[in-house]
Amino acid sequence: MLGAVKMEGHEPSDWSSYYAEPEGYSSVSNMNAGLGMNGMNTYMSMSAAAMGSGSGNMSAGSMNMSSYVGAGMSPSLAGMSPGAGAMAGMGGSAGAAGVAGMGPHLSPSLSPLGGQAAGAMGGLAPYANMNSMSPMYGQAGLSRARDPKTYRRSYTHAKPPYSYISLITMAIQQSPNKMLTLSEIYQWIMDLFPFYRQNQQRWQNSIRHSLSFNDCFLKVPRSPDKPGKGSFWTLHPDSGNMFENGCYLRRQKRFKCEKQLALKEAAGAAGSGKKAAAGAQASQAQLGEAAGPASETPAGTESPHSSASPCQEHKRGGLGELKGTPAAALSPPEPAPSPGQQQQAAAHLLGPPHHPGLPPEAHLKPEHHYAFNHPFSINNLMSSEQQHHHSHHHHQPHKMDLKAYEQVMHYPGYGSPMPGSLAMGPVTNKTGLDASPLAADTSYYQGVYSRPIMNSS
């Protein structure tokens, strides 16, 4: 295309002298002597300045441009398209606009090329919108919002920080009668903590093991006036406050029952008087056998072990029966206890006497009242309305009005308008409860917002 255009002031033979120099020029101004464009340098410098506003990496772009222009200005300036495209990719919309604006301002010496150059340069205008065409070329693609991760669980379904003994203790202490069946303990845990609504067989086995192997829990048989299936479980009356200040996160120490055998006999004898009488006769017979060798000692001598407690005598007598006569012969002589001492020992082994008018579990009901003001106490897990019912010992069945777990754990939830902040006053954030599966029941959270989450004291 350029060969058909005769440029004034130059002969065709003069073009061969300009190709002795390398094609990669150091700057755009070197094109002035090769192409005979008087005003080209000015406009190229202006376009370079325009590109410099869009990108600081202009030197590589100008060398790309000069190499394509020095290659002989391919037909309709199409050779400039790749270089200009590269500059548009580096410089953004400002650089492409500067290149596109170069077409109408070409030198008058290239006036026959004006229309074609303007058309070719105008064809670069779509590259100015390259950032909006594909997100790969612009910053918009890097800052787009990521899709929410589906594998993140809500904090309301996280595992509670309580041990199984803590869960059982909380369930028993909130009950009106201070005793629950195994199924009622299961139901209480599932109602309060959504985590335990799955994998029920695993944690229910752990609950049964905790009830069986901890001395702080006692099994109470059903009385005739309470028909049903399964025995009741209650707290040991001597267990006291196992948890520090009512906080169920950690126990102070493991409770050990020193009178476990006697209390088991007392619990077994609560149903029938005949069983109690048989146990008294058995204990007296064991005490008599243990004191049998002592009858051969002189009346004036006193055994050094005469101050031993009846429980120790009971254990010693049981060991003597297991080991046979050699153990009884090797045991030190002991004086025969009087009938009054035998009655006291039997009463000590059998526990407190039972009144026929009282239910058998009346003596097992713990009467400990502690000020549980800890954030992880049962009073903070339950609402004030339920505490009012329990303070007056209402025995009629009613639906428990419990606080949601995310309020006690201070997790506002993903839809909450106040993420990461702890509400020290009355709770007004109800959007965090929408993630809970219990939110469908409108009466369930009645009374929840009447008390603060954490106590200020």
Swiss-Prot record:
Residues 361-457 are annotated as: Transactivation domain 2. GO terms for biological process: adult locomotory behavior; anatomical structure morphogenesis; cell differentiation; cell fate specification; chromatin organization; dopaminergic neuron differentiation; endocrine pancreas development; negative regulation of epithelial to mesenchymal transition. Residues 159-252 bind DNA. Residues 14-93 are annotated as: Transactivation domain 1. It is found in: Nucleus; Cytoplasm. Residues 280-365 are annotated as: Disordered. Phosphorylation on Thr-156 abolishes binding to target promoters and subsequent transcription activation upon insulin stimulation. A motif (Nuclear localization signal) lies at residues 106-113. The modification Phosphoserine is found at residues 212, 283, 303, 306-307, 309, 436, 457. GO terms for cellular component: cell junction; chromatin; cytoplasm; nucleoplasm; nucleus. Residues 298-310 have a biased composition (Polar residues). Keywords: Activator, Chromatin regulator, Cytoplasm, Developmental protein, DNA-binding, Nucleus, Phosphoprotein, Transcription, Transcription regulation. It holds the Pfam family Forkhead. Its main location: nucleus. Residues 280-292, 339-352 have a biased composition (Low complexity). The modification Phosphothreonine is found at residues 156, 301. GO terms for molecular function: DNA binding; DNA-binding transcription activator activity, RNA polymerase II-specific; DNA-binding transcription factor activity; DNA-binding transcription factor activity, RNA polymerase II-specific; DNA-binding transcription repressor activity, RNA polymerase II-specific; nucleic acid binding; protein domain specific binding; RNA polymerase II cis-regulatory region sequence-specific DNA binding. Signal peptide: none annotated. Binds DNA as a monomer. Binds TLE1. Interacts with FOXA1 and FOXA3. Interacts with PRKDC. Interacts with AKT1. Interacts with TET1; this interaction may recruit TET1 to specific genomic loci to mediate their demethylation. Transcription factor that is involved in embryonic development, establishment of tissue-specific gene expression and regulation of gene expression in differentiated tissues. Is thought to act as a 'pioneer' factor opening the compacted chromatin for other proteins through interactions with nucleosomal core histones and thereby replacing linker histones at target enhancer and/or promoter sites. Binds DNA with the consensus sequence 5'-[AC]A[AT]T[AG]TT[GT][AG][CT]T[CT]-3'. In embryonic development is required for notochord formation. This is Hepatocyte nuclear factor 3-beta.
